[in-house]
């Protein structure tokens, strides 16, 4: 698995019901709280307004790629 870093775009692999988030929602990593736990901001694509912030363990995240040459 690729290492997740601050500013990476990630998707949830599991629901996070305590924050009203569902599997597949996409967010941006904004901080790393402790080893393997990341603060992720979820925002509305149309407005850019954040609708949720959640501390999510790495095992519930998948790093997303948008350029073919970055995926390996």
Predicted region positions:
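Basic/aromatic-rich interaction segments and small domains that mediate binding to polyanionic partners
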Residues: 4-67
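Short intrinsically disordered terminal tails
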Residues: 68-72
